[in-house]
Each structure stands twice: as C-alpha cells, then as structure tokens.
A protein has these predicted regions:
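Bacterial N-terminal signal peptides that target proteins for export
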Residues: 1-8
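Sec/Tat signal peptide C-region and signal peptidase I cleavage site
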Residues: 18-23
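Central antiparallel beta-sheet cores of small beta-barrel/beta-sandwich binding domains
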Residues: 24-119
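Bacterial N-terminal signal peptides
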Residues: 8-17
Length: 119
C-alpha cells in the first residue's frame, strides 16, 4: 500500500474540513490543488485533484483531520497520517483559493504555500 505523502496530508488539511454542516456549500465540486514547498526537505511541488460534494471532500488517502471552512471562505485545518502532520490556513473565494501550510514527517519539518482552482 502506498504511503500518503506530506503533500496529500497538507491537501487534506486544507480541503477535508468541509462538513455536513456546510452541505451544498459554495465550494462543492472538483478542485485542482497545488502545493509548493518553500522551506524544508519535502518535494518541491505536488499537484492532485479532490472532489467536494455536499460539503464533504472525497479522496482515498484522507485519514484523521479537523478544521473548517467558514462562510467567509476562511480555511483552518489540520490532519495526521501515521507520523506525518500538517496544518494550514487560507481562503477560498469563488473558483480559487490560496494559503499557507506547514507540517512534519517524523523529525523533518516543511512549509510552503498552496493554491486551489475549481475545475
């Protein structure tokens, strides 16, 4: 079984917090995510797509997460997968989003920025 990368964890922390309480949110749909490392020993960049339906994100590697997306579009979240942890914040507006993330894999620390674009 392929282990989730720190990028997937960071993505989960930014998108996964959508909950049933935000059903049929303004953020439902398919989103392309791009993560860029600015500091640390993570991959330089990572891209993948997630789907949000009725306010719930679907991606096969989401494990433990908590957080939320406010009606204003403000995003705050964190996720843990095995020895990896990431947290992030930012904002969604219309069909795009952006923010910052930071995390660790074992004793290694990484940080950077993320962008999102609705398909």
């Amino acid at each position: 079984m392929k282990k989730p990368s720190l990028w997937m964890i960071a993505a989960a922390c930014l998108i996964a917090p959508l909950s049933a309480a935000h059903a049929r949110s303004a953020y439902d749909g398919s989103w392309d995510l791009a993560f860029v490392t600015q500091s640390g020993a993570c991959d330089p960049s990572y891209n993948f797509t997630v789907n949000v339906a009725d306010g719930i994100v679907t991606h096969p590697n989401l494990v433990r997460f908590k957080g939320y997306v406010a009606k204003s579009g403000s995003v705050h979240a964190s996720v843990t997968v095995q020895d990896k942890f990431a947290s992030g914040s930012g904002r969604f507006a219309g069909t795009s989003g952006r923010g910052k993330w930071s995390g660790r894999a074992g004793s290694s620390r990484c940080s950077g920025y993320w962008t999102a674009q609705r398909n």
